[in-house]
Amino acid sequence: MDRRAEFKRWKAQCLSKADFSRKGCVDEDVVEIVQLLNGREQFFTTSSCAGRIILLEQGMDSLEVQKQNCCWLLVSHKPCVKDDVIVALKKANGDAILKFEPLVLHVQCRQLQDAQILHSVAIDSGFRNSGITVGKRGKTMLAVRSTHGLEVPLSHKGKLMVTEEYIDFLLKIANHKMEENKKRIERFYNCLQLALEKETTTTNSHPKEKIKEKNNSYKKKSNPGKAHDKCVTEENDKVLENDDDDDPGISVTIFPEDY
Amino acid sequence: MDRRAEFKRWKAQCLSKADFSRKGCVDEDVVEIVQLLNGREQFFTTSSCAGRIILLEQGMDSLEVQKQNCCWLLVSHKPCVKDDVIVALKKANGDAILKFEPLVLHVQCRQLQDAQILHSVAIDSGFRNSGITVGKRGKTMLAVRSTHGLEVPLSHKGKLMVTEEYIDFLLKIANHKMEENKKRIERFYNCLQLALEKETTTTNSHPKEKIKEKNNSYKKKSNPGKAHDKCVTEENDKVLENDDDDDPGISVTIFPEDY
């Protein structure tokens, strides 16, 4: 079977299976992206989480980081208030940790070129920790990830280590990150639509035109005069995150010019 | 110029340049890995940070997440004690955030196959957020990243929001994560050595042998009888992290068999 047919078969097989997540369905905020991707023959999504605030409990001691002993006290895909956390914390007698986790999306791609397009969209939308995985036999996946998290230990052996005022302050930050994450998801959707439209146009155009067109797309510095580049906003650069390459604290040698 | 010669030229150019990081040199814990990679013709490192505890100050309000207003109050590549943070916090009149950031390493690779080998080594060593980037003209980079972070807001508009006891508790966790990160770096170095040795052996062996050998390497489930697979320890799986695919909270459809 050729690669194209093989991918098609896998996709059909994957999408016909039940959703094995605890929730059992795709998160509301990411449904449009999942549908857009699964509607294209070169992609299918294998896992997704739109972003969430979670309160985890780890065994009896967070210094013994055993995954087996971890349970969830609270999971919310919507903004939370202090009382949600206070109530959930009552169930904890180990070490409770509050986390904000941004969008995570895994997409299987027919070929490397498809993953590259999706990767550009992800980076341009602010998901800077995204990356491609290529398996030994060529299975190509894109993981969409952000650096925009939060991970705060709250209690130790059942004892609350912070004040209620602090939890309130923390949730304001977590909710704000959730909003920012939502904006990025919207940006991702818009960028993706443009990229896929462009892809369709170039696929149908003359081969020479196609090459020319390809070389012009996904410029890091967008030309404000070009409507199709508008998804690359400067907003991305204003948000504080672990932007590794810009970070003066990381040992850096000059990159050769982009090729 | 062919790709091989082009890569060689870029590498020479990159490694001859000064280190533009604030520190001006490669972190001690990652020197061996950097040297091992740069000693191979198919790789060169472009940035690295072994892992660190940092105290950042963000403008006057962490809800206005402007990167421009961010400054560093403390950076440590070694374990910290409470007083280090207390002293540094005295300089803050905005919003201070304590972070633990694990190893970050960017490696430019001659071809995709080289990045795949390095990616396997990274994943097997516990750096699960690692990923490949392929530029429009084929520039291939591997980013080594872990999920093993910590990000805790400590003060708001200059006011400390937590107790000293909490800071002490937090640093125990951060220091523990630093230790775990160090173990993973060692694991990465050992795995990398084995992978590169194997690569050399297979490159020099008969082509048919080479293919056979390649298909046997980097098994997820290692065969305990085989010495060359010993770098894949079960330890990795015990550590609590955002292991996206295992997470029952993430909408998941069945992966087609690895190919």
Swiss-Prot record, chains A, B:
Pathway terms, separated by semicolons: tRNA modification; wybutosine-tRNA(Phe) biosynthesis
Pfam families recorded: TYW3
Cellular component GO terms held in the UniProt record: cytoplasm
Catalytic activity: 4-demethyl-7-[(3S)-3-amino-3-carboxypropyl]wyosine(37) in tRNA(Phe) + S-adenosyl-L-methionine = 7-[(3S)-3-amino-3-carboxypropyl]wyosine(37) in tRNA(Phe) + S-adenosyl-L-homocysteine + H(+)
InterPro entries to which the protein is assigned, alphabetical: tRNA_yW-synthesising, tRNA_yW-synthesising-like_sf
Family assignment from sequence similarity: Belongs to the TYW3 family.
Name of the molecule in the record: tRNA wybutosine-synthesizing protein 3 homolog
Organism whose genome encodes this protein: Sus scrofa (Pig)
Chain's gene name: TYW3
